[in-house]
Amino acid sequence: MKTYFLVLCLAVLAVASKPVPFRADSLTISVGTFTSPSAVWHKGSPKHPQVFVWFHGGMQSSKCAKGYEAGGMLVPYLEKSQKENIVVSVSACKENHWLTPTVLKTVDVMLDSVEARFQIQIDTVSLVGVSDGGLGIAGYTLYGKRAVRARLLVSTNLSAVSDARNLSKAIRVRQGSWTFLQGGSDRLYPSNRTMPWLDEFCSVLGAKQCVIHFDNRGEHDWSWWTANREGWIRDFVP
């Protein structure tokens, strides 16, 4: 009897300690005539989560439903976190790119829907952008309605937004941290074009607020960074 009771207790303990997997829920967010396929990743019903917003690359692609899957690429880095986390991603598409007011508003409408669903308040967010998803980070930083705690920009080029010195002086840009992962073998955004901009941008913000991780072997795709510089990504995700 004692042995049976012990085995039963161990079985219950094993079930209780088994990590709860993230669940992905898909939805569409509409702003005016624009409809954005979107998704939210969560564990159960979080009460005080950190919220991450993923801005996908290929913002003017004719593949207009990237938001259904894009944010899922961050989930493996949150699985073992002791904190409650939510990831959301929306879709940009063709002329509705990351720097248009409509798509930037879509992000906040999505966050509003997450607030309503889980009965929580989202005051601050962390942003992750890959390739031209970095433009979404810049746009939301300047025009989004929520404060930004931290940003991770992977293989990006923000020179289309503004020159580095002027952008770094914007009040909202100076709130929250900036972390850049940039590669020397990025064929889309060559380092001889991107690094001078980044160096000037971070020189104004200062080393405590703005960090550049450069790998001369680094390629453009997120998959290269997950395979070769996973530690830099984990440093961003608590």
Each predicted region: which residue ranges?
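Alpha/beta-hydrolase active-site loop
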Residues: 98-118
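Short substrate-entry loop that stabilizes the transition state in hydrolases
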Residues: 48-97, 160
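Primarily recognizes the serine-hydrolase "nucleophile elbow" in alpha/beta-hydrolase
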Residues: 117, 123-172
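Loop/turn elements at helix/coil->beta-strand transitions in domains of secreted/extracellular proteins
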Residues: 47-51, 83-86, 121-124, 145-151, ...
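The feature captures the conserved acid-bearing segment of alpha/beta-hydrolase catalytic domains
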Residues: 150, 155-230
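Sec-dependent N-terminal signal peptides
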Residues: 3-13
